[in-house]
Amino acid sequence: MLLAAMCLALLGCLQAQELKGHVSIILLGATGDLAKKYLWQGLFQLYLDEAGKGHSFSFHGAALTAPQQGQKLMDKVLESLSCPKDLVPSRCDELKGQFLQLSQYRQLKTVEDYQTLNKDIETQVQQDGLWEAGRIFYFSVPPFAYADIARNINSSCRPHPGAWLRVVFEKPFGHDHLSAQQLASELGSFFQEEEMYRVDHYLGKQAVAQILPFRDQNRKALDGLWNRHHVERVEIILKETIDAEGRASFYEEYGVIRDTLQNHLTEILTLVAMELPLNISSSAAVLQHKLWAFQALRGLQKSSAILGQYQAYSGQVRRELQKPDGFQSLTPTFAGVLVHIDNLRWEGVPFILMSGKALDERVGYVRIVFKNRAYCTQSERHWVPEQSRCLPQQIIFYIGHGELGHPAILVSRNLFKPSLPTQKWKEVQDQPGLRLFGRPLSDYYAYRPVREQDAYSTLLSHIFHCRKESFITTENLLASWVFWTPLLDSLAFEVPRPYPGGAENGQLLDFEFSGGQLTFSQQQLEVLIPDLGSVPKPSDFQVLGARYRQSPLITAWPEELISKLASDIEAAAVQAVRHFGKFHLALSGGSSPIALFQQLATGHYSFPWAHTHLWLVDERCVPLSDPDSNFQGLQAHLLQHVRVPYYNIHPMPVHLHQRLCAEEDQGAQTYASEISALVANSSFDLVLLGMGTDGHTASLFPQSPTGLDGDQLVVLTESPFRPHQRMSLSLPLINRAKKVAVLVMGRTKREITTLVSRVGHEPKKWPISGVVPLSGQLVWYMDYEAFLG
């Protein structure tokens, strides 16, 4: 029967057309929800598209279920398959009959089952006089099952040399960078990179799949517009009306950021932001350009995100996971994240990623909003959509649902008339009364697909045709997790804002962005956290003054502490410029000062940057462009946002003559000479220090005498942490400063804070204890967690 079906299927391509070989497609998890809803229909669509074009096919549905029961379940799914509306019914019946005959169920549970499958495929190909082109294994199973299945395929089910193997995986691909690395390493031990296809089904959605072709086909119109000079912002949005009921186990582990932002929305972001390769048909070029886009993403801070949770969620978790009555989940079901890209094209343009459950509508879209610099002298009633520059200018890739109800591409008529392939996209008829993004539909050139197709049908076709650009490579996957993991870690204990769900949300989740920060527009009056007692807010405490090691101590919650320190630095700067015409500020690197840099960049517009010289307290011996470089952190979070003359910026010369911190290059002496030449008496106006958990400060470390005394102003040191080589201001130079501020933040600093408060002047054991300005002032800035624990 199977042979007869194959002969019938190949009848159309036997006339003078050479056969292209046999393809076996094995769907693992063939009776699961994803397979029932999308994958079998997608495989049927693949057969409809490819029947008669030279390949022969066999489809194997596989699961752990016993053969008889599994076949029964699979047959029920196959009977419900449908053809496109434009396919003649008789042709549909014919092809569906062939597909059913070519599809069979088999149990894949043991090594022997995989060996039997391999033998059956080889026997079938030989008996039918065919040659094997390749095999596709689609893993529609939970990730914990990947390793065993991969091992069995690799050992028992690979095709003979000359035939290809393609293995397809569904997310999640880990829950952070480390777990993603581990999974990638495990799969990489069984399969080559070119054999693996990681699915993000949003890349198969028609509007998303059209982003790169649209940019390519409209290069002439977009070349001058697709950049920071013309784009005001980019919104990448996915809203759902449903909640997480029935999926509490999954959602508690992943939450909304891992579920949608880290994958779907980030992949879309790269399609919008990446540089266009010369040939978008080259998978390798597209994937490389996407990777470069990942590498240009500015690191996220806690302040880059806002979180919410619909009010019924914790109750659902308690019921589904048998949690105690008082359990309150911190898992967010809503998130907005502000992303910036540090390159010439997108510098300063906010990319807003937002997704959530239990919202007011189901809709997904990508919206590029252009700056409006026009002023129109006539009243709005005389504005003509095709001509008036005062009307909003935007391009929208409408993913689906919402008021429009279907995928679409919308371009404001006052921008340009886009070019799209007419065989795939057609103009949308106007719908009077329908308004999208503040304008009537008639204000747009609007296009929709000639034939709507689900994402999995598109992706299965791309797998078959080896179009890797629609999938996620190991390198791009890990780059995404490198970007998202620090934010996820910083938000792990953040309490999300509760919201009622649906239309009742009102303006509760509206948010605003400024600089690198997102904040809710509406202040929340009350946060209910059952059984956790009263949770203090920063506003409940004032900035407190005290003394620490005989010097002034400022303590506060982090937000108030950073604000106070920034104000004190500005006051010192204004005073120095008033008296001496310049302000010399030496800054430390690391994570603690980042919030300070951001505060200075976004909240201190009277700061005398034009008269400020910026120096580094210490630097890692890496290129200045390296993410580990202290200068790179300063550049990302401060320098690019303020107007400091470039000749007033003094990075440490750690990279000379193609070498890093080589003593013979005399980088430390060069920096010392520069300080002596520009800073009066080598006395900085203000030095900002931190304190490590081992008592180190700058890059002066315990049990190392380097830089603790003597005449050297700048020294090379060795750190116990990677990268080991450092350059640092010496303790004698630091102590010449007019003011030294030590910033100490976080619960992990509590132990060293207590210890240092009790020791005397012991810089060899605790370098921070050697910070005693000769004639200047030392002030400690500590948050409550560092000071009180």
UniProtKB/Swiss-Prot annotation:
GO biological process, one term: regulation of cortisol biosynthetic process
Pathway(s) of this molecule: Carbohydrate degradation; pentose phosphate pathway; D-ribulose 5-phosphate from D-glucose 6-phosphate (oxidative stage); Carbohydrate degradation; pentose phosphate pathway; D-ribulose 5-phosphate from D-glucose 6-phosphate (oxidative stage): step 2/3
Top-level taxonomic group: Eukaryota
Subcellular location: Endoplasmic reticulum lumen
Xref: InterPro entries: 6-phosphogluconolactonase_DevB, G6P_DH, G6P_DH_AS, G6P_DH_C, G6P_DH_NAD-bd, Glc/Gal-6P_isomerase, NAD(P)-bd_dom_sf, NagB/RpiA_transferase-like
Region (Hexose-6-phosphate dehydrogenase): 17-524
Pfam family, one: G6PD_C
Modified residues (N6-succinyllysine): 205, 424
A cellular component annotation (GO) from this entry: sarcoplasmic reticulum
Secreted is among the record's keywords: no
Reaction catalyzed: D-glucose 6-phosphate + NAD(+) = 6-phospho-D-glucono-1,5-lactone + NADH + H(+); D-glucose 6-phosphate + NADP(+) = 6-phospho-D-glucono-1,5-lactone + NADPH + H(+); 6-phospho-D-glucono-1,5-lactone + H2O = 6-phospho-D-gluconate + H(+); 2-deoxy-D-glucose 6-phosphate + NAD(+) = 2-deoxy-6-phospho-D-glucono-1,5-lactone + NADH + H(+)
Keyword Endoplasmic reticulum: yes
PROSITE patterns per record: G6P_DEHYDROGENASE
Region: 6-phosphogluconolactonase, residue numbers: 539-789
Annotated positions binding NADP(+) 1: 29-36, 146, 171
Biological role: Bifunctional enzyme localized in the lumen of the endoplasmic reticulum that catalyzes the first two steps of the oxidative branch of the pentose phosphate pathway/shunt, an alternative to glycolysis and a major source of reducing power and metabolic intermediates for biosynthetic processes. Has a hexose-6-phosphate dehydrogenase activity, with broad substrate specificity compared to glucose-6-phosphate 1-dehydrogenase/G6PD, and catalyzes the first step of the pentose phosphate pathway.
Entry-linked NCBIfam families: pgl
Subunit structure: Homodimer.
Family membership noted in the UniProt record: In the N-terminal section; belongs to the glucose-6-phosphate dehydrogenase family. In the C-terminal section; belongs to the glucosamine/galactosamine-6-phosphate isomerase family. 6-phosphogluconolactonase subfamily.
Protein name according to UniProt: GDH/6PGL endoplasmic bifunctional protein
Record organism: Mus musculus
Gene responsible for this protein: H6pd
